[in-house]
């Protein structure tokens, strides 16, 4: 009996169980733990499309009709990297949702075919062989300052946006808030034609509960409390009281100046209630110098933003200028300069690296155009993982050695921009992972470009964005190959394949009949019982201490020394600028 070498098998069908894949130009490797497509010993029985290949009439393609259950699309032979594991499988999509993860083909001539992956004449094929698939990324911290940020987000693999804004207004440039029913309605209408899911945050800075409830009825999915609007303990309590009654999440950017209390006062106002703390880091804002300590608390769902990911030799200089612009400060005013310098602390930026690696900071967002870059959430997450492997070695549970697999680290880091923000904001019943029943928001990557530029972005089952060559060429691949909108990005299709996440009170108030949107309005799940323990693979609660004079950080009693990176992967090797 003829046998295939592993190398030849990978060339024909893609890697299989036991094979390791390098992620872009990082030091990170992942190993396939299961192959649901076939694998060695079953070679020739895999679903592969092309001339002379398997998925042809009366061969790998059967006669089953769509009415009889054939999937609309099958992604063949993809390596799935998700929080729950790293496997190879075919992915079936029907009506914009994932219906099966297993083996696809024609059960009349092939063994082990999943009943929901029977390929028929109505089935389209996306070739995933030799490619990686991840869940569409969720950016949990987006300032909607201009519509172009959405194109940039899609180009990097983001399919869900949590945040707020109304355009280039001063409030939006600073605070991630869409305030009030009129602005919420207009933004939901404006975003209806983009192939991304949207969850807008209303303004939480008030002690008037009526002002909060009207925003929930008007389309907000939750609230944002920001220091630039005045973050008093009373406002925190009032906002969380309404959130508890409504079941929605509150995102908090706390008080850098400590005007209205210190971190202990903010924690007292939160009073053990679930809260998503933005900028649980060393530079983005919040109580100086010790906001990072909130990551130790069981009710706090901490995130940080990508401009400090990872700690590099350029971080300090870059942030000072960014802060001056984003928060309307004047470098010629001593008080403004002191504010900026107190907010940017190399020691806490460095500690942020470690807290991500041990799973104490659970999420990463962009803070787009407000000190962060919307197109770099995925990339900077994996740069951080690379730097931490270089510095700390293998993560607990991963084998040691230069060429050993980093599956546990990969699963932890991919969760930071997929399932963790979905759970935190009550979206995980629809998005956040590659699992049956969820929207088919999927990103395909060539391994050499993993985390840098997607091969294709599938939104609700339709290809919305892809790396595409010259449209006047004779084939799709001639240069320049650029991320470009596809048919799935047309307004009608985008509305059919994407959702607006809103509070349940919006649905009850009949919002869908009051605004000009074509997509579904989906209520967020009740998140008020969600705590740190619910953050998959990112639930650590170490003891964190910050010296108020030197800003030295101790994590479980150990000082974390600053070692800013001088060189990163996924950088100039891929980009001119």
Swiss-Prot record:
A GO biological process this protein is involved in?
Answer: urea catabolic process
Active site residues of this protein:
327 (proton donor)
Where is the protein localized? Cytoplasm
MF terms from GO for this chain are: nickel cation binding; urease activity
Specify the pathway. Answer: Nitrogen metabolism; urea degradation; CO(2) and NH(3) from urea (urease route): step 1/1
Q: Which family does it belong to?
A: Belongs to the metallo-dependent hydrolases superfamily. Urease alpha subunit family.
- Cofactor binding notes: Binds 2 nickel ions per subunit.
Q: What is its EC number?
A: 3.5.1.5
Gene3D superfamilies referenced in this protein's UniProt entry, alphabetically: Metal-dependent hydrolases (3.20.20.140), Urease, subunit C, domain 1 (2.30.40.10)
Task: Identify the cofactor(s).
Answer: Ni cation
Q: Name the chemical reaction catalysed here.
A: urea + 2 H2O + H(+) = hydrogencarbonate + 2 NH4(+)
GO terms for cellular component: cytoplasm
Q: Name one Pfam family in it.
A: Urease_alpha
Q: Enumerate the PROSITE patterns for this protein.
A: UREASE_1 (PS01120), UREASE_2 (PS00145), UREASE_3 (PS51368)
Question: Sites of the modification N6-carboxylysine?
Answer: 224
Protein name as annotated: Urease subunit alpha
Q: Which NCBIfam families match?
A: PRK13206.1, PRK13207.1, urease_alph
Provide the alphabetized UniProt keywords: Cytoplasm, Hydrolase, Metal-binding, Nickel
Say where the protein is mainly found. cytoplasm
Top-rank taxon? Bacteria
Report the top EC class in one word. Answer: hydrolase
């Amino acid at each position: 009996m003829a046998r295939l070498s592993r190398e030849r098998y990978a060339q024909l069908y893609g890697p299989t169980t036991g094979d390791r894949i390098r992620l872009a130009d990082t030091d990170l490797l992942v190993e396939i733990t299961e192959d649901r497509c076939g694998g060695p010993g079953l070679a020739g029985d895999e679903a592969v499309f092309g001339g002379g290949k398997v998925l042809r009439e009366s061969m790998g393609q059967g006669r089953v009709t769509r009415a009889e259950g054939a999937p609309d699309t099958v992604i063949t032979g993809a390596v799935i990297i998700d929080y729950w594991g790293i496997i190879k499988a075919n992915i079936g999509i029907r009506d914009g949702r994932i219906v099966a993860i297993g083996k696809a083909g024609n059960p009349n001539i092939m063994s082990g075919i999943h009943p929901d992956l029977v390929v028929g004449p109505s089935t389209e094929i996306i070739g995933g062989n030799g490619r990686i698939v991840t869940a569409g990324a969720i950016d949990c911290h987006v300032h909607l300052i201009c519509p172009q940020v959405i194109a940039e987000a899609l180009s990097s693999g983001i399919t869900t946006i949590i945040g707020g804004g109304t355009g280039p207004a001063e409030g939006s440039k600073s605070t991630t808030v869409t305030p009030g029913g009129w602005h919420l309605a207009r933004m939901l209408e404006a975003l209806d034609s983009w192939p991304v899911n949207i969850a807008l945050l209303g303004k939480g800075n008030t002690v008037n509960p009526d002002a909060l409830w009207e925003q929930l009825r008007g389309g907000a999915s939750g609230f944002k409390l920001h220091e630039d609007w005045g973050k008093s303990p009373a406002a925190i309590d009032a906002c969380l009281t309404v959130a508890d009654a409504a079941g929605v999440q509150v995102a908090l950017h706390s008080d850098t100046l400590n005007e209205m209390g210190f971190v202990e006062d903010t924690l007292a106002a939160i009073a053990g209630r679930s809260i998503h703390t933005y900028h649980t880091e060393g530079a983005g804002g919040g109580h100086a110098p010790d906001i990072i300590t909130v990551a130790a608390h069981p009710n706090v769902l901490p995130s940080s933003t990508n401009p400090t990911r990872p700690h590099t030799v350029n971080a300090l200089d870059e942030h000072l200028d960014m802060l001056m612009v984003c928060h309307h400060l004047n470098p010629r005013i001593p008080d403004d300069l002191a504010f900026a310098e107190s907010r940017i602390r190399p020691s806490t930026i460095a500690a942020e690296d470690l807290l991500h690696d041990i799973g104490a900071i659970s999420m990463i967002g962009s803070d787009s155009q407000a000190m962060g870059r919307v197109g770099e959430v995925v990339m900077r997450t994996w740069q951080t993982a690379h730097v931490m492997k270089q510095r700390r070695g293998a993560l607990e549970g991963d084998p040691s050695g230069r060429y050993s697999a980093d599956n546990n680290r990969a699963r932890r880091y991919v969760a930071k921009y997929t399932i963790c923000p979905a759970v935190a904001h009550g979206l995980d019943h629809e998005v956040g992972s590659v699992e049956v029943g969820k929207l088919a928001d999927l990103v395909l990557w060539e391994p050499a470009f993993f985390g840098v530029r997607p091969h294709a972005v599938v939104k609700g089952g339709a290809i919305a964005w892809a790396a595409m060559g010259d449209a006047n060429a004779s084939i799709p691949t001639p240069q320049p190959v650029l991320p470009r909108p596809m048919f799935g990005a047309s307004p009608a299709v985008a509305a059919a394949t994407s959702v607006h996440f809103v509070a349940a009170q919006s649905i009850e108030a009949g919002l869908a009949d009051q605004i000009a949107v074509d997509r579904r309005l989906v209520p967020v799940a009740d998140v008020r019982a969600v705590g740190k323990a619910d953050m998959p693979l990112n639930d650590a609660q170490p003891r964190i201490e910050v010296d108020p004079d030197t800003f030295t950080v101790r994590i479980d009693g150990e000082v974390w020394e600053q070692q800013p990176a001088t060189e990163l992967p996924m950088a100039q090797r891929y980009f001119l600028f």
